Protein backbone atom coordinates (compact mmCIF):
# COMPACT_ATOMS: atom_id res chain seq x y z
CA UNK A 1 0.00 0.00 0.00
CA UNK A 2 2.81 2.39 0.90
CA UNK A 3 4.55 1.80 -2.43
CA UNK A 4 1.29 2.25 -4.36
CA UNK A 5 0.62 5.56 -2.66
CA UNK A 6 4.17 6.76 -3.24
CA UNK A 7 4.08 5.82 -6.92
CA UNK A 8 0.71 7.51 -7.39
CA UNK A 9 1.90 10.67 -5.63
CA UNK A 10 5.15 10.73 -7.59
CA UNK A 11 3.44 10.27 -10.95
CA UNK A 12 0.99 13.03 -10.11
CA UNK A 13 3.83 15.38 -9.26
CA UNK A 14 5.74 14.39 -12.39
CA UNK A 15 2.75 14.99 -14.64
CA UNK A 16 2.26 18.47 -13.23
CA UNK A 17 5.93 19.33 -13.64
CA UNK A 18 6.04 18.21 -17.25
CA UNK A 19 3.60 20.98 -18.05
CA UNK A 20 6.08 23.58 -16.80
CA UNK A 21 9.23 24.81 -18.57
CA UNK A 22 12.47 23.49 -17.09
CA UNK A 23 14.91 25.91 -15.54
CA UNK A 24 18.59 25.16 -15.14
CA UNK A 25 19.84 27.61 -12.59
CA UNK A 26 18.50 26.99 -9.08
CA UNK A 27 21.20 25.53 -6.86
CA UNK A 28 18.98 23.62 -4.44
CA UNK A 29 16.77 22.31 -7.27
CA UNK A 30 19.35 20.01 -8.85
CA UNK A 31 20.16 16.41 -7.98
CA UNK A 32 23.79 17.43 -7.53
CA UNK A 33 22.82 20.29 -5.23
CA UNK A 34 23.28 20.18 -1.46
CA UNK A 35 19.59 19.74 -0.63
CA UNK A 36 19.13 16.63 -2.74
CA UNK A 37 22.48 15.20 -1.68
CA UNK A 38 21.60 15.62 1.99
CA UNK A 39 18.26 13.95 1.28
CA UNK A 40 20.00 10.95 -0.26
CA UNK A 41 22.41 10.87 2.68
CA UNK A 42 19.46 10.69 5.07
CA UNK A 43 17.94 7.78 3.15
CA UNK A 44 21.25 5.90 3.02
CA UNK A 45 21.95 6.28 6.73
CA UNK A 46 18.39 6.18 8.03
CA UNK A 47 19.09 9.45 9.84
CA UNK A 48 16.67 12.27 8.91
CA UNK A 49 18.89 15.03 10.38
CA UNK A 50 20.80 15.91 7.17
CA UNK A 51 17.52 16.48 5.33
CA UNK A 52 15.64 18.09 8.21
CA UNK A 53 18.07 20.98 8.41
CA UNK A 54 16.74 22.20 5.05
CA UNK A 55 13.21 22.73 6.38
CA UNK A 56 11.86 24.78 9.25
CA UNK A 57 10.35 23.41 12.48
CA UNK A 58 6.80 23.95 11.23
CA UNK A 59 7.45 21.56 8.33
CA UNK A 60 9.47 18.98 10.23
CA UNK A 61 6.61 16.55 10.90
CA UNK A 62 5.56 16.55 7.25
CA UNK A 63 9.08 15.73 6.09
CA UNK A 64 9.54 13.07 8.78
CA UNK A 65 6.37 11.32 7.60
CA UNK A 66 7.53 11.36 3.99
CA UNK A 67 10.96 10.14 5.12
CA UNK A 68 9.55 7.14 7.01
CA UNK A 69 7.35 6.16 4.06
CA UNK A 70 10.26 6.44 1.65
CA UNK A 71 12.48 4.32 3.91
CA UNK A 72 9.84 1.59 4.04
CA UNK A 73 9.30 1.63 0.28
CA UNK A 74 13.04 1.40 -0.48
CA UNK A 75 13.10 -2.10 1.00
CA UNK A 76 10.57 -3.43 -1.52
CA UNK A 77 13.02 -3.82 -4.40
CA UNK A 78 15.23 -1.85 -6.82
CA UNK A 79 12.35 -0.23 -8.72
CA UNK A 80 10.61 0.77 -5.51
CA UNK A 81 13.87 2.12 -4.14
CA UNK A 82 14.36 4.41 -7.12
CA UNK A 83 10.81 5.74 -7.01
CA UNK A 84 10.89 6.24 -3.24
CA UNK A 85 14.18 8.13 -3.36
CA UNK A 86 12.97 10.43 -6.10
CA UNK A 87 9.68 11.00 -4.28
CA UNK A 88 11.46 11.93 -1.07
CA UNK A 89 13.87 14.32 -2.81
CA UNK A 90 11.00 15.99 -4.68
CA UNK A 91 9.18 16.59 -1.40
CA UNK A 92 12.29 17.77 0.42
CA UNK A 93 13.13 20.35 -2.24
CA UNK A 94 9.48 21.42 -2.57
CA UNK A 95 9.15 22.05 1.17
CA UNK A 96 12.50 23.84 1.30
CA UNK A 97 11.57 26.10 -1.61
CA UNK A 98 8.21 26.92 -0.07
CA UNK A 99 10.01 27.91 3.12
CA UNK A 100 12.08 30.37 1.09
CA UNK A 101 8.94 31.82 -0.45
CA UNK A 102 10.21 30.58 -3.82
CA UNK A 103 8.36 28.69 -6.57
CA UNK A 104 8.98 24.99 -7.09
CA UNK A 105 9.32 23.54 -10.57
CA UNK A 106 10.77 20.14 -9.86
CA UNK A 107 14.20 18.67 -9.23
CA UNK A 108 16.53 19.00 -12.21
CA UNK A 109 18.66 15.98 -13.24
CA UNK A 110 22.36 15.35 -12.70
CA UNK A 111 24.44 17.44 -15.06
CA UNK A 112 22.07 20.40 -15.11
CA UNK A 113 24.22 23.55 -15.45
CA UNK A 114 24.08 26.19 -12.74
CA UNK A 115 25.03 29.86 -12.71
CA UNK A 116 28.82 30.32 -12.65
CA UNK A 117 28.47 32.40 -9.49
CA UNK A 118 26.75 29.48 -7.78
CA UNK A 119 29.53 27.11 -8.80
CA UNK A 120 32.10 29.63 -7.57
CA UNK A 121 30.27 30.07 -4.27
CA UNK A 122 30.29 26.29 -3.83
CA UNK A 123 34.03 26.25 -4.41
CA UNK A 124 34.49 29.10 -1.94
CA UNK A 125 32.61 27.28 0.81
CA UNK A 126 34.52 24.07 0.13
CA UNK A 127 37.92 25.77 0.19
CA UNK A 128 37.23 28.40 2.85
CA UNK A 129 38.45 31.08 0.43
CA UNK A 130 36.47 33.66 -1.55
CA UNK A 131 38.96 33.65 -4.43
CA UNK A 132 36.67 31.70 -6.81
CA UNK A 133 34.18 34.60 -6.69
CA UNK A 134 36.71 37.30 -7.57
CA UNK A 135 35.59 39.09 -10.70
CA UNK A 136 32.08 37.64 -10.47
CA UNK A 137 30.75 39.92 -7.72
CA UNK A 138 30.88 43.73 -8.07
CA UNK A 139 33.43 45.49 -5.86
CA UNK A 140 30.76 47.49 -4.06
CA UNK A 141 29.18 44.23 -2.83
CA UNK A 142 32.40 42.57 -1.73
CA UNK A 143 32.41 43.73 1.90
CA UNK A 144 28.91 42.38 2.51
CA UNK A 145 29.80 39.18 0.68
CA UNK A 146 32.78 38.73 2.99
CA UNK A 147 30.55 39.25 6.03
CA UNK A 148 28.07 36.61 4.90
CA UNK A 149 30.85 34.23 3.93
CA UNK A 150 32.45 34.54 7.35
CA UNK A 151 29.08 33.91 9.02
CA UNK A 152 28.59 30.74 6.98
CA UNK A 153 32.09 29.43 7.71
CA UNK A 154 31.61 30.17 11.40
CA UNK A 155 28.64 27.79 11.52
CA UNK A 156 29.87 25.22 9.01
CA UNK A 157 31.44 22.76 11.45
CA UNK A 158 28.36 21.88 13.48
CA UNK A 159 27.26 18.65 15.14
CA UNK A 160 25.46 16.90 12.28
CA UNK A 161 23.04 15.28 14.73
CA UNK A 162 21.92 18.73 15.93
CA UNK A 163 19.15 19.79 13.54
CA UNK A 164 18.89 23.28 15.02
CA UNK A 165 22.62 23.84 14.50
CA UNK A 166 22.24 22.55 10.96
CA UNK A 167 19.43 25.00 10.30
CA UNK A 168 21.51 27.84 11.68
CA UNK A 169 24.27 26.94 9.23
CA UNK A 170 21.88 26.62 6.29
CA UNK A 171 20.45 30.05 7.06
CA UNK A 172 23.88 31.67 6.73
CA UNK A 173 24.87 29.40 3.84
CA UNK A 174 21.87 30.33 1.69
CA UNK A 175 22.15 34.01 2.64
CA UNK A 176 25.71 33.92 1.29
CA UNK A 177 24.66 32.15 -1.91
CA UNK A 178 21.76 34.51 -2.55
CA UNK A 179 24.06 37.51 -2.21
CA UNK A 180 26.71 35.94 -4.43
CA UNK A 181 24.02 35.46 -7.08
CA UNK A 182 23.08 39.13 -6.89
CA UNK A 183 20.08 39.01 -4.59
CA UNK A 184 19.97 41.32 -1.59
CA UNK A 185 17.33 39.79 0.64
CA UNK A 186 18.30 37.74 3.67
CA UNK A 187 17.49 34.05 3.48
CA UNK A 188 16.02 34.21 6.95
CA UNK A 189 13.33 36.62 5.84
CA UNK A 190 11.84 33.94 3.62
CA UNK A 191 12.83 30.79 5.41
CA UNK A 192 13.50 31.22 9.10
CA UNK A 193 10.75 33.69 9.84
CA UNK A 194 8.27 31.89 7.62
CA UNK A 195 8.68 28.87 9.86
CA UNK A 196 8.92 30.76 13.15
CA UNK A 197 12.60 29.90 13.36
CA UNK A 198 14.20 28.48 10.23
CA UNK A 199 16.61 26.08 5.31
CA UNK A 200 19.58 26.52 -3.24
Predicted regions and their residues:
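Feature marks short, highly hydrophobic, charge-poor N-terminal signal-anchor/signal peptide-like helices
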Residues: 1-8
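N-terminal Sec/ER secretory leader and immediately downstream segment
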Residues: 24-89, 94
Amino acid sequence: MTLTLIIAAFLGTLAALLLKPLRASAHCDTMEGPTAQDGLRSLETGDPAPALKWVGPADENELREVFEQALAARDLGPAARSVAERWFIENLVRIHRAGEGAPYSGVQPYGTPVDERVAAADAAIASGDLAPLEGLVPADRWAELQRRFAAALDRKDYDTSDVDAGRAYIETYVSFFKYAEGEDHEHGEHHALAHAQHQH
